[in-house]
Amino acid sequence: LQASAEKSLDSHLTKIESRPGFQHPKKSVHQRGKATRYLQGAVVSLDNSSGAILAMVGGRSFGDSAFNRVYRARRQVGSTFKPFVYANAFETTGLLPGAYVNDDPIRLSHNGGPVWSPQNSDGTFTGLQPSAIGLIRSRNTMSIRVGQLGGINNVRELARTLKFGEIPDSPVIYLGAFETTPMTVTSAMSIFATK
């Protein structure tokens, strides 16, 4: 599995580098000993039962960069956090996947902060939809409403329990607007496979 993960990561990133218009340095022209500026990535695979690492690739070439992106690269979590927002609401409120949630525009602020009007990625709003659709289609406005239903403190506590660390006390967390590592996200996701 380790060799496959290494090969797959390099293959996918090489494909991206070969796209027309790709303007950044490429691994194929990198000179050893110089700063590593070419496209990087990370892969981690865990055994859901034991948490054992099955494969881990911290970058494209350890010889060029010893920085392990699996453990050390903090990136915005984004929509990968939405399953935890929904899981919290399912557990704490009894929300069911078939329960309808509004996907219309929303305006909100938190603790007297500025008003925020998030959009859906496709720029549309679809009215009442089953909550499962909100998760499956990653609808931002529905995810915020589901997060509010479950409660920001409950979502933050779940995130702490799953070792996401400190996350903002703001509704932006419902959309994953905070940073953590690939290892943290992968470890947290294993709860869905074991429940």
What is each residue range found by the language model?
Residues 4, 8, 84, 132, ...:
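Short, solvent-exposed alpha-helical surface patches in non-cytosolic proteins
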Residues 24-28, 105, 169-175:
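Short linear capping/connector segments at secondary-structure termini
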Residues 161-195:
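Active-site-proximal helix/loop microenvironment
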Residues 49, 95-155, 170, 194:
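Conserved catalytic neighborhood of penicillin-recognizing serine enzymes
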Residues 1-83, 95-99, 153-160:
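Periplasmic/cell-envelope proteins involved in peptidoglycan metabolism and beta-lactam response
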